[in-house]
Curated annotation (Swiss-Prot):
Basic and acidic residues composition bias: residue spans: 694-704, 782-793
Coiled coil segments of this chain: 225-262
Listed InterPro entries: AH/BAR_dom_sf, BAR_dom, GRAF_fam, PH-like_dom_sf, PH_domain, PH_GRAF, Rho_GTPase_activation_prot, RhoGAP_dom
Compositional bias ranges of the Polar residues kind: 670-693, 710-721
Gene label: arhgap42a
Source species, domain of life: Eukaryota
Every Rho-GAP domain range: 376-572
Protein task: May influence blood pressure by functioning as a GTPase-activating protein in vascular smooth muscle.
Species of origin: Danio rerio (Zebrafish)
Pfam families, per database record: BAR_3 (PF16746), PH (PF00169), RhoGAP (PF00620)
Protein name: Rho GTPase-activating protein 42
UniProt entry keywords in alphabetical sequence: Coiled coil, GTPase activation
Domain PH: 265-374
Molecular function in Gene Ontology: GTPase activator activity
GO biological process, one term: signal transduction
Length: 805
């Protein structure tokens, strides 16, 4: 029930009912005053919490900004460069959000606290002062009235008239105070309807403006997020392949002789103990020694292992270099130490006695110094009986495999990724390459299933005595794709292909043509160019040196294969440009190191356009809008091209964006589309089975087990998303933009209903198919300009939306 009205006429009567109604208004004003005090207190606590949150976010952002990624190897892929730069981009995004929050905090006191305090003090305070005056005049008036009424009628007339005049004045003062008090109370009650509510509305306006800014920043962040997600997918894919190769190398190292000599710069190197003669005997000091048999240079570096203090670790002194004259094994009975030998050098008189770590290690040093024995290497990867050759039987086998796959298995899910049973593969290889087998042996489809044939084809290529792309050109191919110039990568690989021997080039043409056909059916078999690169990269470009450094280049081997597949027609049907300079490892390594992060995708820094306040109602999404996501176009699960951006010809003037993309870019509203395959855009592998090295087969799984594993794989569980993805490839860019799917190749699983996902990027929420097909247009939101500029040019944390990613 509302407050009773106060009539001015009742002020003259001053009835108990009037006083009761007046008391109701006073109680309400007192309650309002207490509420405003509490509200101001809570508001100050909220502002303090916002300041603390802002400080914490800025500290977190600074930590991201200060961290520096370092990768193994002398060069980084575009994916690694973008990932290394991502923390700085995240920091920039957080700083931009905090810039808006700081504006909210700075304005909160003026918008919320000050107006409320002013209303409480000036309006409610004035009403309290009016009450004090009213109470004072009431008491004074009724006191005078009682005295006046107590006068005796026998008093003189002049005295009575004076008393009447005095009471009339007091009554008028009382009436004036009562009228002013009633007027002020009613004024305050009416003023609080707007002066009390307006500060709260203004504060919420600023708060929703901040939220709306975050909403728009999320839209601008969407293309970068998608590109970075593709980079993460590709890096994970390469990691799985490289890890298996490195693990196999570790096993071979473990199974090798204890004192094997790995290929390296020196003929022999390792720790030796050197005898140093003293006046009271001799000491043995550990040195790290190297020997180069070509120049006969022997180097000793004194090393001392500190076990504590600030110098914990290996302390190296400047090396001593000598030219070897002779090396003689030390007789066992001439010294009480084992494994010793003597050397003579030009720079010193007398002999230097050295102690090796074992008998076999001494033998290696002795053989190296007189040059009589070859270097011991790791166990051979292939036995002689396993080697295959580029002969007529090999070419016929490859052609038969390709014909069989293209005739009956081109649409098989996980083609070439899912291996056959090892025993069947070995039986196939034995029957085809047996000494008495005919050169034109056919592959019976009833005998050999598709998985066995594809595994046999990979096994043949893997077991070549020399990899198909040769050891001689291996480093040249690697350095070609390490270039920052997208066009140069393609042109350099093109030129190097024509330096291959004729048989190698012919076989490579045969294989890449087939892989190009396989990739064109990736909508069904899910074997994108990137997946094929991961499988065939280590097979076609096996490194001659079995080292960890060589394993780190597997990711670049995959890129070479991607370039060959994507540019098959150009590379194998057109002559290379004779003016293209071939890669030089030294120059490319230096240039890459100097600008290692300059090519990273980023959210361009720049000033942003200031905007007026958005009506709070416009910041609230309606029931049909995307309430929980900044964009319905979550990251696509996989385009049908290469995941990596390395093999795309971004700088080629002959390639342009798709018409649908250009149409959206000209629309003037915020409309991001997935880059077309013609651009240097993200190209994702589809969600199939776990990435596997091309040189590994599962010897334990049968065909049925593989099919069962595939049926429960993430790719199968996400089949609604896959079908949606494949269907949208032929649709407009608007539909592509609305596609919702998951990102991770290996660990991102999509539940039934396509509502949730988890994996390497857990923060990217997958939406349902119904939501994913919903248009991004929201009628309640104002159109977004292509670029926004802020008046405050000093703020460098803002960013404008990037161009095509």
């Amino acid at each position: 029930m509302g407050l009773p009205a106060l009539e001015f006429s009742d002020s003259f009567l001053d009835s108990p009912d009037f006083r009761e109604r007046l008391k109701c208004h006073e109680i309400e004003l007192d309650r309002t005053n207490k509420f405003i005090k509490e509200l101001i207190k809570d508001g100050n606590m909220l502002i303090s919490a916002l300041k603390s949150l802002s400080a914490a976010v800025q500290k977190f952002s600074q930590s991201l900004q200060d961290f520096q990624f370092e990768c193994i190897g002398d060069a980084e892929t575009d994916d690694e460069i973008n990932i290394a730069q991502s923390f700085k981009e995240f920091s920039q995004l957080l700083n931009t959000v905090e810039e808006e929050r700081r504006r909210l905090i700075q304005n909160a006191d003026d918008v919320l606290i000050t107006p409320l305090e002013k209303f409480r003090k000036e309006q409610i305070g004035a009403a309290k002062e009016g009450k004090k005056k009213f109470d004072k005049e009431t008491e004074k008036y009724y006191t005078v009235l009682e005295k006046h009424l107590s006068l005796s009628s026998r008093k003189k007339e002049s005295l009575l008239q004076e008393a009447d005049t005095q009471i009339s004045k007091e009554r008028q003062v009382f009436y004036d105070a009562s009228l002013e008090y009633v007027f002020k109370i009613q004024e305050v009650q009416e003023r609080k309807k707007f002066e009390f509510v307006e500060p709260l509305l203004a504060f919420l306006q600023g708060l929703f403006t901040f939220y709306h800014e975050g909403y728009e920043l999320a839209h601008e962040f969407e293309p970068y997020k998608q590109q970075l997600q593709f980079n993460l997918q590709n890096t994970r894919n390469n990691f799985e392949s490289t890890r298996q190769e490195v693990e196999n190398l570790m096993r071979r190292i473990r199974s090798a002789e204890q004192d094997f000599k790995a290929p390296g710069q020196w003929t022999m190197e390792g720790f030796l103990y050197v005898q140093e003669k003293r006046p009271l005997g001799c000491t043995w000091t550990r040195h790290y020694c190297t020997y180069e048999k070509g120049t006969k240079m022997f180097t000793m570096s004194n090393s001392e292992l500190k076990t504590g203090g600030k110098q914990n670790g290996l302390i190296m002194s400047p090396p001593e270099m000598f030219k070897l004259k002779s090396c003689i094994r030390r007789r066992t009975d001439s010294i009480d130490k084992r494994f010793c030998f003597d050397i003579e050098v030009v720079e010193r008189h007398g002999i230097i006695t050295l102690q090796s770590l074992s008998e076999s290690n001494r033998r290696l040093w002795m053989e190296a110094m007189d040059g009589k024995e070859p270097i011991y290497t790791l166990p051979a990867l292939l036995s002689k009986k396993e080697e295959t050759f580029l002969n007529e039987a090999g070419f016929n086998f490859v052609r038969k495999c390709i014909e069989s796959v293209e005739a009956r298995g081109i649409n098989t899910l996980g083609l070439y990724r899912i291996g056959g049973v090892n025993s069947k593969v070995q039986r196939l290889m034995t029957s085809v390459f047996a000494a008495k087998a005919p050169a034109d042996l056919d592959l019976d489809p009833d005998t050999w299933d598709n998985k066995t044939i594809t595994s046999g084809l990979k096994n043949y290529l893997r077991c070549l005595a020399e990899p198909l792309m040769t050891y001689r050109l291996h480093k040249d191919f690697i350095m070609a794709v390490k270039s920052d110039d997208q066009n140069y990568r393609v042109c350099a690989v093109h030129a190097l292909v024509y330096k291959l021997p004729d048989k190698n080039k012919e076989m490579l043409n045969l294989l890449i043509k087939h892989l190009h056909v396989v990739s064109t059916h990736s909508q069904k078999n899910l074997m994108t160019v990137s997946n094929l690169g991961v499988i065939f990269g280590p097979t076609l470009m096996r490194s001659q040196e079995e080292t960890v450094a060589a394993m780190m280049n597997i990711k670049f081997q995959n890129i070479v294969v991607e370039i060959l597949i994507e540019n098959y027609d150009k590379i194998f049907h057109q002559a290379p440009d004779p003016n293209v300079p071939l890669p030089h490892p030294q120059s490319h390594s230096q240039s890459r190191g100097g600008a290692r992060r300059s090519k990273a995708i980023c959210l361009s820094s720049g000033s942003r356009k200031s905007r007026g306040l958005y009506p709070p109602a416009l910041c609230l999404a309606d029931a049909d809008s995307d309430t929980f996501s900044s964009s319905p176009s979550s990251t696509p699960m996989g385009s049908m091209e290469s995941l990596s951006s390395h093999s795309s010809e971004q700088n080629s003037c002959s390639k342009t964006g798709s018409p649908s993309r250009n149409k959206h870019k000209a629309s003037g509203s915020l409309c991001w589309t997935t880059p077309s395959p013609s651009t240097n855009g993200p190209k994702s592998p589809a969600c199939t089975t776990s990435p596997d090295s091309s040189s590994k087969e599962d010897a334990n799984k049968t065909d049925g087990e593989w099919e069962e594993a595939l049926s429960t794989s993430p790719g199968d569980r996400s089949s609604p998303a896959s079908e949606l993805l494949h269907r949208t490839l032929g649709e407009t860019a608007e539909d592509q933009r609305s596609l919702s799917s998951c990102s991770s190749l290996t660990s991102l699983h999509i539940s039934e209903g396509f509502r949730s996902c988890h994996g390497s990027i857990q923060s990217l929420v997958s939406r349902s198919q119904r939501d994913s097909l919903k248009s991004l247009h929201m009628p309640d939101l104002p159109p977004k300009d292509g670029m926004r500029f802020r008046d405050d040019s000093s703020a460098s944390n803002g960013y404008q939306r990037p161009g095509s990613v």
